[in-house]
Structures are given as C-alpha cells and as structure tokens.
C-alpha cells in the first residue's frame, strides 16, 4: 500500500503550514501538522505490517496549494518519524517537477519564494538531499523529470535506491526496453491523458516514433 503524502492530497494539506490553519492537536507546529500522516501510517502498519507500506512525499510541491513556509524543517521531521517505522520505501518528488507547470516555471517560482522570503531556504538547498539524509535505512526512491538519459546517475552514486517513471509510461508501452537500448522516448498527448476510452492512453505504438 502506498500512502500518498504529497501532491496536494489530504496528508499533504495537513503537513503544509500555509494550508493547515487548524488550532487543535493537528495544526500549528510541524509535529502537530505531521500527526495525521503519522497516525494514518500507524493504522495501515497495524493492519498489514510496515514492510508492505510505502509513502510518497513532494516536499517542494505546489500542486493546487502554496509552497510550505519551511519545507526542510517540515519534511525532515516527518521523514525522521517515518524512518523509525521501517516501511518498504519512501518516494520523493524532485523539486523541478509539477503537475501543471513546466520545469522552468517551477524553478523560477521556487527561486522567487526564496527571494521574497515566503519560504525559509537557500537556493542551493532546493534539492532532496536534506530529506534523503533522514532516511538512513529506508530505501529511497525519486520521481519527477527523469528520462532515459538522467535516470542512472543518482542510483549509480548510491544517493538513491531507484528512480521511478509515471508519465513516460503512458506514451511508451515499451519504456524499459527503450531505456535499455537508448531509444528516443515518445511524448504523451496531454490533451487525451485524462479522457475517456483507450485513445491517447493505451494505443501508443512501440519503438521510436518518427
């Protein structure tokens, strides 16, 4: 079971200091804002065991909500608590990626947040290293902005245990084989990604598309 604690979903809303305005035990401090995520995690672990549970976080995410005021502090705490629980793995979304924004726009927005003081961080700290450091024994995965060329380095260096793909699988039913052979990947048709029926979803050809 993958508990989605990122991308603007419910756990992420509780964790976010600019969205969670509660004044009870689930709001205010980072510990309180993490309470819902951790209580949910503990309930799932109690039901099926920690080794069958994984989590996904997007510390630098801005999907349908503002950037957290202090992502490093907020998510370092949450991940430190997750580390204690011995889950199967944690997948972290790269800061460069966003569901609705281009990579250039996302980076510009993050840099602007540093400059105007709406986020506590330095430009050089906008990466996953602080969060990876909290996961000393938990397998670390990452997603967002990877392709057939840049998907090896972090694993080969030992910084990550694996990287994951999502969008590329839509346009490339033979994604693994294409990466293995170094073939050009096919871009998905964004306009049909969320439409009904197989068109633009399960009808992409295999091999390189000219």
Question: In which residue ranges do the predicted regions lie?
Answer:
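Flavin-dependent oxidoreductase catalytic cores
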Residues: 1-210
């Amino acid at each position: 079971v993958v508990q989605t604690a990122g991308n603007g979903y419910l756990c992420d809303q509780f964790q976010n200091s600019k969205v969670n305005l509660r004044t009870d035990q689930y709001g205010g401090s980072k510990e309180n804002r993490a309470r819902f995520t951790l209580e949910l995690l503990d309930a799932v672990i109690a039901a099926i065991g920690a080794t069958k549970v994984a989590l996904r976080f997007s510390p630098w995410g801005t999907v349908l909500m503002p950037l957290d005021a202090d992502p490093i502090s907020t998510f370092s705490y949450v991940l430190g608590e997750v580390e204690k629980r011995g889950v199967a793995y944690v997948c972290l979304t790269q800061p460069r990626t966003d569901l609705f924004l281009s990579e250039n726009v996302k980076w510009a927005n993050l840099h602007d947040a540093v400059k105007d003081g709406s986020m506590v961080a330095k430009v050089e700290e906008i990466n996953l290293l602080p969060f990876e450091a909290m996961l000393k024994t938990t397998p670390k995965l990452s997603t967002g902005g990877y392709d057939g060329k840049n998907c090896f380095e972090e694993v080969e260096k030992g910084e990550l245990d694996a990287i994951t793909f999502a969008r590329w699988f839509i346009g490339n039913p033979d994604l693994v084989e294409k990466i293995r052979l170094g073939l050009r990947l096919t871009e998905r048709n964004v306009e049909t990604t969320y439409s009904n029926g197989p068109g633009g979803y399960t009808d992409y050809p295999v091999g390189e598309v000219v």
